[in-house]
Each structure stands twice: as structure tokens, then as C-alpha cells.
A protein has these predicted regions:
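Short cysteine clusters
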Residues: 43, 62-65
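N-terminal pre-ligand scaffold of iron-sulfur
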Residues: 1-57, 71, 75, 83-101
Length: 101
């Protein structure tokens, strides 16, 4: 496991993800009111990029079939998604947002 830089804290807008590609993994990092959260950027229902979906109240909606996920826990909240998203630890080091993968 290694920590990966996403960017300076001041470059994050609330509810707007930043996406980082690490090998085959696409990780979306969100700044919510209570902190930073990292999830797999690919919907578990069908291949769609969640970072292109609608984010509100700590939830991300898939742009393809409107499946919703909790950004903090990765939990699938609405059909058609039934499988939770992978989540990753985050931290802020010297003003830079990082996630562990």
C-alpha cells in the first residue's frame, strides 16, 4: 500500500471530485463538508464513471442508470447497483490531499 497525492486542499471544491489513475484503478476523491473521501470511480452496476455523475448530500449518482452510492462508506443505496464501491483511506499532509491504495 502506498499514499498517492491528489492535489492541494485549496484546489478542491465541495462535492466536486478529483480523479487519479493508479495503474488500472480510477479513484475519485471528494471534498465533503466533513472531510475528504476516496472511492472507486467506476460504477459497480455497469462501466460508468461516477465522477461524471451528480453529487449531493454525500451521495454520488451514476450518470448511466442513476444508481446511488454513499461517498463516505461506498455503500450501494439504490438499484440497479447491488455491490458496494471500494473506499480508500485519505489524509492531508502538508496541505496536500492523499489517498492510500
Amino acid at each position: 500500500m502506498a499514499w498517492h497525492d491528489v492535489g492541494p486542499v485549496e484546489n478542491f471544491e465541495l462535492d466536486t471530485p478529483k480523479v487519479v489513475q493508479v495503474g488500472e484503478e480510477r479513484i475519485a476523491v471528494f471534498h465533503l463538508e466533513d472531510g475528504f473521501f476516496a472511492i472507486n470511480d467506476v460504477c459497480t452496476h455497469e462501466y460508468a464513471l461516477l465522477s461524471e455523475g451528480f453529487c449531493e448530500a454525500g451521495r454520488i449518482e451514476c450518470p448511466l442508470h442513476q444508481a446511488c452510492f454513499d461517498i463516505r462508506s461506498g455503500k450501494a443505496l439504490d438499484e440497479p447497483a447491488e455491490i458496494d464501491l471500494a473506499t480508500y483511506p485519505t489524509r492531508v499532509e502538508r496541505g496536500v490531499v492523499q489517498f492510500e491504495l
